[in-house]
Amino acid sequence: MSKAVTTALAFSCDRHTPPTNFAAAAAAAAQSGVVDELLIWDQMTNFWPRQLWHPDNTPMAAIVPDLDSYSDAFAMSGYLAASAPGIGLTISTDAIRRGPAELTQTMMTLANMTEGRAKVMIGAGEAKQITPYGWRRSEGLARLEDQLKGFNALWASTEPVDLPGNHWTFKQAWLGQSRTHRPHIWALGGGPKLFYLATTYADGISAIVPCVAPTPESWAHTVSTMKAELERKGRDPEQFEFGIWFMSLVHEDADLLERALDNPLMRWMAGVFGRLDQSAWDAEGIEPPLPRDWHYAVKLLPVTWTESEIQGLLRRTTHEMAQKSFVYGTPESVAAQVEQYVEAGATWVSVCDILPLLLDPVDAQAGLARNIEICARLKKAGKT
């Protein structure tokens, strides 16, 4: 590697867990010296149907009543910034549920709290976060354009701003003169329109592996294509960031990992999320478990799934598909797999380890140390 990659520790903050527990974990990450940022997800509900969260599938279900009681990501980010000074904050959100002026104001505030180490990744949105609450997922990309253009306009001017938009229009919009620290704004996701918006207006882009880039070579192709587009637009591609979330299972016990791949919770994730475009399974000679035009971001509403629909998907999702849907192994093995994507152009990485959902509480708590070890290995590799 030519330089050390930026590392982010994924935090899924729920309301069942005392906030002080997250503060302690954030402090441990900050003190490690190898974790640059926390990644906090702005979610309304999780990926799994409620029927799958029970003690037959995981001992954690006897302790945590549900997986959907998320904390507000922005409120928790402020709390964690105060609890662990020196750590950076990255929030992933969608373009629909907050206005561009409000989001810009919030991110300016977090940038001040972290001395410039604040980032927001904005996607076109997931139906599960949007449709049940009265928003329209179909407006996602148009609203993303408004978000990116609105942020840039508000940051660039200390005078009132007029800006036409698709859904939000500024008329003498003003957030004052303070410009202490600029937050970073990235696009989150994929597709031609989102790539166009990212290379035109954003500071970077992030995607999830292996779900959209199952090999380092496929990721390298994405990076090279986007860098060429940045150059065509007169932007410096070396100033643009490329981030990856790794959907991961991390543990020292290989047998435990193989059993985890057959657990209904992980098999479900492989079915709905293992390849975001279901048709992508065709290239690997695998029959998709859902219709080829089915995409989780547009179609997945976990609360509405019936028991028969759930069991049907689990039957159609094979062990091989689960193996191809996660980056999994020991901390050393996962770090080595992540390094390949860094060599292929990733500049920011977060190992999103969801295995603790299946573990007993003591083993689940050890997940923090495993993921910090991965960050340490990545930092060490960046110095060689």
Predicted regions located by residue number:
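Short, acidic/polar
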Residues: 17-29, 103-106, 188-197, 261, ...
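An alpha-helical appendage that flanks or caps ligand/catalytic pockets
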Residues: 139-175, 216-343
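Alpha-helix-loop-beta-strand connector modules within alpha/beta enzyme cores
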Residues: 57-89, 228-229, 365-384
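Internal, glycine-rich beta/alpha segment that forms the wall or movable "lid"
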Residues: 3, 99-239, 292-295
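N-terminal beta1-alpha1-beta2 module of alpha/beta enzyme domains
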Residues: 1-83, 182-183
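Hydrophobic faces of well-ordered beta-strands that scaffold small-molecule active sites
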Residues: 5-11, 36-40, 89-93, 118-122, ...
